[in-house]
Amino acid sequence: MNKRKILVPLGDKSYEVTLEAGILNNISEELLKIGITKKRKILVISNEEISNLYGEKFLNNLKDNKFQAKMFLIKAGESYKNLKTLSEIYDVAFEFGLDRNSIIIALGGGIVGDVSGFAAATWLRGIEYIQIPTTLLSMVDSSVGGKTGVNHPKGKNLIGAFNQPKAVFIDPETLKSLPKREFSAGMAEVIKYGVIRDKELFEYLEIEKNKNELINLKNEYLIKIINSSIKTKSNVVSQDEHENGVRAILNYGHSFGHVIENLCGYGKFLHGEAISIGMNIAGKIAIEKGLWSKEELERQRILLESYDLPTEIPKINKEDVLTILMGDKKVRDGKMRFILPKEIGAVDIYDDVEDSLFLKFFS
């Protein structure tokens, strides 16, 4: 049986991630199992692309099983992850009569999940929500851990809340319709888990046969890497839900990734592609500080590139890099904190990195 359940242990906010091929076809049954009764209204939030693939079937499954469900589609793309979209969700929630006993389901990638989770956190001071991620990146990263929010013109995710979902359902079948580039972008986050905490996963991803089966989207192999990634994330989040300490290691590659996304213009690089370049920069800094070997940096680079991810650092202005980094949420008391690798499978947090040490990598 290929059904996996992973507990995210957070006391009274604990929840399960259920991972199974084809689970989307039995969604009503799964909702009943976790206590979602048919009296509760369900607002499904998705986007047009996902809706065209699964939306109608998903909504019909709920309605055929006598759930009171409505679907609202938000526009796709990072530029729509904003307060205007959030306000549109509130309008629909009001018209549909979403009360405190109602529930929001996020059906889509990371943007759908982030916006839906924040809408749930703030509608009537908080209602329950469920994550059903449909991209590899959202499966292994944003759907687990409770980070929700929208962007502000001054930066990504500046408006948000920690809001844990009631449950997460993952169906690797949805990856079959994912563009190849999006799949590769998701692999950046999987490789990240290998570098920060899971040497065994890193080595599994290096094996040629596994690589081929993953690129060919074989469920058994997908379930293995998604399961490993979520276990690592669950373990870290359960120790530090609000990112006051160890949870920051999940941001390996992200500080420089956000710099690249921001300065190259959102859209030039997918999030995972920017993270891949960010991991390469962090790896180079680790060599400058004598933390890990050139061989390990090279293994990381080769693995990223073998999944069609970029590692070359784009030409961007050094002063702009500093400005963006100082606005990073990981800055504490005016000090930038960097997640740097010590070896494959272990990283640490450093706040003693001189500007000159990383600015040399930017033209």
Curated annotation (Swiss-Prot):
GO biological process: amino acid biosynthetic process; aromatic amino acid family biosynthetic process; chorismate biosynthetic process
Cofactor binding: number and manner: Binds 1 divalent metal cation per subunit. Can use either Co(2+) or Zn(2+).
Cofactor(s) this protein cannot do without: Co(2+); Zn(2+); NAD(+)
Binding residues annotated for Zn(2+), in chain numbering: E189, H254, H271
Reaction catalysis annotation: 7-phospho-2-dehydro-3-deoxy-D-arabino-heptonate = 3-dehydroquinate + phosphate
Matching SUPFAM superfamilies: Dehydroquinate synthase-like
Major site of localization recorded for this protein: cytoplasm
RNA-binding listed as a keyword: no
PANTHER family attached to this UniProt entry: 3-DEHYDROQUINATE SYNTHASE, 3-DEHYDROQUINATE SYNTHASE, CHLOROPLASTIC
Protein name: 3-dehydroquinate synthase
Source species of the chain: Prochlorococcus marinus (strain AS9601)
Species lineage: Bacteria, Bacillati, Cyanobacteriota, Cyanophyceae, Synechococcales
